[in-house]
Amino acid sequence: LRRWTLDVVRQVVETSPFTPGVSIVAPAYNEGVNIVENVNSLLQQKYPKFEVIIVNDGSKDDTLEKLIDNFSLIEVPYDYVYHINCKPFKRLFRSTDYHFKNLTVVDKTNGGTKADAVNGGLNVAQYPYFINTDSDCILSKDAIYQCVFPILLNHDIIAVSGTMSMSNGFELKNNEIVEFKTSSNPLAVFQDLEY
């Protein structure tokens, strides 16, 4: 029954003009090593109305430069209001490439906490629902559907959480998890239990 219901919700969401939009907010601090692959992963969501907001939280490495170069970003003027307190923005970027039309990059002063970076992303979010993740996380391609599904079925629900696992031993293909493997490292096993 749940599978059938999910399929019906998916069909309605894909065709309805009332589909709720979702903003994925992902802070990044010194993530230059993996930022391009991870942002590509976030952009592969199978959902009709979403945006990805990467918040460069004062990185001291090449995180911002890699984002600009790989996603054809240009600085854009943006009138925003700080609805939620955070350290000041330096610049805002959007892509000139249609394939990345739903990507926004905020370059802001480091706030010292992840919460400050998330607040910065929420200040530019255009949708009523948001997913708070890290820029080094890999989301399943239907993660937004999995989060929106319970909300559409029960309007009393105000928050949804996903299952998190450590990437120790995961097999990735095209920025998607294709196989889960249990690590042989006892420390990694305890990390999995913690999450």
Which stretches of residues belong to each language-model region?
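Long helical/loop segments within the catalytic core of UDP-sugar-dependent glycosyltransferases
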Residues: 76-117, 123, 141, 146-195
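A conserved acidic beta->alpha catalytic loop
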Residues: 56-76, 110
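Short, acidic, metal-binding catalytic loop of nucleotide-sugar glycosyltransferases
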Residues: 40-49, 69-77
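The conserved acidic donor/metal-binding loop of glycosyltransferases
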Residues: 134-138
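Short, well-formed alpha-helical segments that are part of the catalytic scaffolds
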Residues: 6-9, 31-44, 59, 65, ...
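N-terminal membrane-anchoring/stem segments of glycan-assembly enzymes
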Residues: 1-18
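Short aromatic/hydrophobic "clamp" motif used to bind/position activated sugar donors
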Residues: 130
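Cell-envelope/extracellular polymer assembly enzymes that use nucleotide-activated donors
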Residues: 20-23, 51
